Amino acid sequence: MAHKKGASSSRNGRDSNAQRLGVKRFGGQSVSAGEILVRQRGTHFHPGVNVGRGGDDTLFALSAGAVEFGTKRGRKTVNIVPAAAEA
């Protein structure tokens, strides 16, 4: 095996694509069922009322309503407050 880097070779030149993580819908925004709220690695935000968690820890809305961020037992949670029923 060569231990010298031969002519015009380089050990650099690799980089990974960004994962585009973060909050996608912020507090007070109205969402419909199935919309992604937070993309994350691990549970930085925990699912609350009307919020589901995917296999990659993505949080998504289970029903339509307004997004609400809060804390419960010292954990950051994301809830969906259902929109008021139309009369």
Swiss-Prot record:
Chain residue ranges for the region called Disordered: 1-25
SUPFAM superfamilies assigned: Ribosomal L27 protein-like
Any Gene Ontology biological process: translation
Signal peptide coordinates: none
Biased composition (Polar residues): 7-19
Family: Belongs to the bacterial ribosomal protein bL27 family.
NCBIfam families, A to Z: L27
Protein name: Large ribosomal subunit protein bL27
Native source species: Rhodococcus jostii (strain RHA1)
Gene: rpmA
